[in-house]
Design a protein with these regions (language model features):
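N-terminal accessory targeting/assembly segments
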Residues: 1-105
């Protein structure tokens, strides 16, 4: 069982309630794959950061949590580009998945 955190972005096209529904579904998929969700993070963004998907402040917040709780996996509710996945993996130093990769893992 891997300690896992979920990350979702709330955009102008998606309200908080819809984001919660998506994260609920992602948590179910994570549990099905054998992960244990220890925290959820969300960020309000008009458009995701092309390099790291999240803003720098949220990256620091998530990184501090990863270090404190010994998280092994971070799962994003949205699809990441290969470059974003690489960049985030270097920063967080743990396994990074997006929704599509999680579903393929199941």
């Amino acid at each position: 069982m891997e300690n896992t955190i979920l990350i979702g972005v709330i955009t102008q096209d998606q309200d908080k309630e819809k984001s919660k529904e998506y994260l609920d579904e992602l948590e179910f998929l994570t549990t099905t794959a054998g992960g244990v969700v220890v925290k959820r993070f969300t960020q309000n963004l008009d458009t995701p950061n092309p390099k790291t998907f999240l803003g720098s402040g949220k990256i620091k917040e998530v990184l501090n949590f990863i270090d404190a709780v010994k998280v092994q996996t971070v799962i994003f509710d949205d699809e990441l580009s290969p470059a974003q996945e690489r960049n985030i993996s270097k920063i967080f130093n743990c396994k990074i998945l997006d929704r599509t990769n999680l579903i393929l893992d199941i």
